[in-house]
C-alpha cells in the first residue's frame, strides 16, 4: 500500500543563540492510509517535533515530507496552511480551546476559517458534538467542563473539516485513566471509519490501542512493532 505520509531523511536542528541543537536526525518513516500509529519515546526524544513535521507545522532542516504524494518543501506557506486545514486535524495535550467560546463555537471555528456558511457549520458542529457524546454540552464554556469533556470537544473540533489524518500530541496526558481510555476509544472508532491516526504518547497502555508503534530516542527512530 502506498504511504499517505512519508518522511525521507528528515532532520531538524534548532538554533539557540550560537548553539545548534539537533532534535531529529535522518528520520525515515512511512505511514499507510487507515493506519493507527503511536510514536513513543522518553521526554526530549523528539516525539512532538516529529509530529510537527508530519503535520506540516514546521519545516525540516534537511530531507522532505510528503503528504498524499505532495512534497511540502515545494509548497508556499499559504499552500501548506491550506493543506493542513483540509487534510489534518490536530489534538493537543492542553486542549487549546478558546475559553470565551462555548463548545459549539470551538467546534465551528475551523469551519469559519475555511469560510463555510453559517447553517452548514452549525449543523456539522452539532453532529460532531453528538459523535463525541457531548451534544447536550453545546452551550457550555470550557471552564464548565471536565478535562475529559474538553478533550472530546478538541477531537470534535479536529474533525470539523473532515480531515484524512488525525494527529494527537499526548492527548491523554492531562486526563485520569478512565477519561484517557474513553479518548483512545474515540480514536480507535475514527480509525475504523477510515481515518489515519498518529498519536504521540509515553504511555504503553495508550499505545496498545494502535496498530503500529514507532520508538524514537535522541532524535532517531530506534525501533517499531506491530
Can you name each region flagged by the protein language model?
Residues 2-216:
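ABC family nucleotide-binding domain
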Residues 213-226:
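H-loop (His-switch) and adjacent beta-strand-loop-beta switch element
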